[in-house]
C-alpha cells in the first residue's frame, strides 16, 4: 500500500476521474464523499486551512481516500493541532466518512492508522459527523482497538431514514394512526384548494432558477420567525450552488418542485447515490397559515422515491426533529470519533475537555474545552 498526501487544490483537481471511479466501488458511499463535494468545499471555505487528503494506492490503482485537514485550536483553547475531516468548518457534511474500496478496506484501514502513527504533528484526531454503522470506519475502529489505541466514540446526533416498501399505501400503513390521519388530511386540503403537482427539474438552466427560489423560500420562512439561517451566509449559498451544478450532469441531483395552481410552493433537493435517495434541503411557503406545504412536500418526495422503483431507502439525514420522526421509522446514531496523541499536552487537554463536558451537563457555563458552540458538528438537515 502506497500512501501519499495531497495538500492543494491542483492536486485535488487531478484526482477527479480516479475519485469518481472509486466512489461507487467503496463501502457505504454517499453524495457527501463525492469529489464534487470536497473540491468545491475547498474552493469556497478552504482559505487559511491546510489540506491533508490522504491518498492510498495499491499497485498504482487508487483504493482509498481520507479527506482530512489541519486545524489549530485558539490559544485560550490550548493551541492544540487537530487532524479532522476536511468539511467540518463553514459547511458540514451531514454524513462524513472515509472512502475505501470494498475489496481493500482492511488494508486501507491499516495504512491509515500507520500514517497517523507516523505523522507526529497532531495532538488530537477528531472525526465528526460519522454514521455509527459506517462500514469503512467500523473497520478502522476495529483495527485501532486491535492495536490497543481505540477511538473514543461520542454520541452527536441521530440520522433518520425510511426503508422503502413496495407501495406508498404500505408506507402509510407503517405510520402511527394519528400521523397517517393528519397527513391524509393535510394533503387532501391542498388538493381540494389547489391544483397540486410534483415535478422534477429538467434542464440545468431550471436548476439555477429553482435553486435561487429555494434559497429565497428558506430566507423568508426564517426571517418570519426572527431567526438566522445558513442561507444568510453568501459563502454557504455559493458552495451549495457550485456543488449542485457540478454534480447535476452525473444524474445524481433531482430538484423536486411542488406547484399549487402553477405557482412554486415548495422545492426539495434530492441527492442520489446507488439505491439511496437523500432528501437534503427544502424550502416552501404556505399560501395560507393552515396549509402544511413542507410536510406534504416531504411525503410526496418519499412517494416519488417509492414509485421510481430504483431506491431501497430514503434518507432524511442528520437532525432528530419531530417532523422527521413522524415520517421516518428508522434512525441511526451519528457520532464523533476522537483520539489523543500520547503527550502530556494532549492528556491535559483531554482532562480539561472532560471537565468542560461535566460542567455543561450540570448546567454550569463552559470554560473552553470541547463544549463551545459549533463543536457538535451535526449535519444541516433543514435550514
Regions found by a protein language model. Name each.
Residues 1, 5, 9, 70, ...:
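Active-site/acyl-donor-binding loops of N-acyltransferases
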Residues 3-85, 127-290, 381-382:
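A conserved beta-strand-loop-helix scaffold within acyl/acetyltransferase catalytic domains
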Residues 86-121:
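A gly/proline- and charged-residue-enriched helix-loop-helix capping module
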Residues 94-105, 282-290, 320:
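A short, internal acetyl-CoA/4′-phosphopantetheine-binding micro-motif in the GNAT/acyltransferase core
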Residues 104-115, 290-302:
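Conserved acetyl-CoA-binding loop-helix of GNAT-fold acetyltransferases
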Residues 116, 247, 305:
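Hydrophobic pocket-lining residues that define ligand/cofactor binding sites across diverse proteins
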Residues 121-130, 305-318:
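Conserved GNAT acetyl-CoA-binding A-motif
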Residues 262, 294, 298-301, 305, ...:
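Hydrophobic, well-ordered secondary-structure elements that form the walls
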Amino acid at each position: 500500500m502506497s500512501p501519499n498526501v495531497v495538500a492543494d487544490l491542483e492536486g485535488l483537481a487531478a484526482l477527479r476521474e480516479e475519485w469518481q471511479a472509486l466512489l461507487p466501488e467503496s463501502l457505504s458511499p454517499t453524495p457527501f464523499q463525492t469529489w464534487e463535494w470536497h473540491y468545491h468545499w475547498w474552493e469556497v471555505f478552504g482559505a487559511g486551512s491546510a489540506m491533508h487528503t490522504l491518498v492510498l494506492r495499491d499497485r498504482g490503482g487508487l483504493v482509498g481516500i481520507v479527506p482530512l485537514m489541519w486545524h489549530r485550536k485558539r490559544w485560550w483553547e490550548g493551541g492544540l493541532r487537530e487532524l479532522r475531516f476536511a468539511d467540518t468548518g463553514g459547511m458540514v457534511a451531514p454524513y462524513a466518512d472515509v472512502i475505501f474500496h470494498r475489496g481493500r478496506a482492511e488494508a486501507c484501514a491499516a495504512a491509515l492508522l500507520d500514517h497517523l502513527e507516523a505523522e507526529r504533528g497532531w495532538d488530537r484526531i477528531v472525526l465528526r459527523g460519522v454514521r455509527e454503522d459506517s462500514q469503512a470506519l467500523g473497520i478502522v475502529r476495529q483495527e485501532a482497538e486491535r492495536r490497543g489505541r481505540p477511538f473514543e466514540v461520542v454520541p452527536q446526533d441521530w440520522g433518520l431514514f425510511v426503508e422503502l416498501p413496495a407501495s406508498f399505501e404500505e408506507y402509510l400503513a407503517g405510520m402511527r394512526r394519528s400521523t397517517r390521519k393528519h397527513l391524509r388530511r393535510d394533503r387532501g386540503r391542498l388538493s381540494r384548494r389547489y391544483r397540486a403537482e410534483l415535478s422534477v427539474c429538467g434542464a440545468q438552466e431550471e436548476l439555477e432558477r429553482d435553486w435561487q427560489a429555494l434559497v429565497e423560500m428558506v430566507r423568508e420562512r426564517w426571517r418570519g420567525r426572527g431567526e438566522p439561517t445558513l442561507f444568510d451566509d453568501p459563502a454557504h449559498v455559493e458552495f451549495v450552488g457550485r456543488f449542485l451544478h457540478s454534480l447535476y450532469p452525473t444524474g445524481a441531483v433531482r430538484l423536486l418542485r411542488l406547484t399549487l395552481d402553477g405557482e412554486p410552493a415548495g422545492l426539495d433537493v434530492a441527492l442520489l447515490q446507488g439505491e439511496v435517495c437523500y432528501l437534503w434541503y427544502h424550502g416552501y411557503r404556505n399560501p395560507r397559515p393552515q396549509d402544511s406545504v413542507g410536510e406534504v412536500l416531504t411525503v410526496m418526495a418519499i412517494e416519488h422515491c417509492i414509485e421510481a422503483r430504483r431506491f431501497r431507502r430514503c434518507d432524511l439525514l442528520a437532525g432528530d426533529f419531530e417532523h422527521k420522526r413522524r415520517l421516518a421509522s428508522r434512525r441511526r446514531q451519528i457520532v464523533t470519533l476522537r483520539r489523543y496523541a500520547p503527550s502530556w499536552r494532549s492528556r491535559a487537554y483531554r482532562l480539561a475537555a472532560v471537565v468542560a463536558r461535566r460542567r455543561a451537563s450540570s448546567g454550569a457555563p463552559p470554560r473552553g474545552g470541547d463544549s463551545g458552540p459549533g463543536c457538535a458538528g451535526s449535519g444541516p438537515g433543514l435550514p
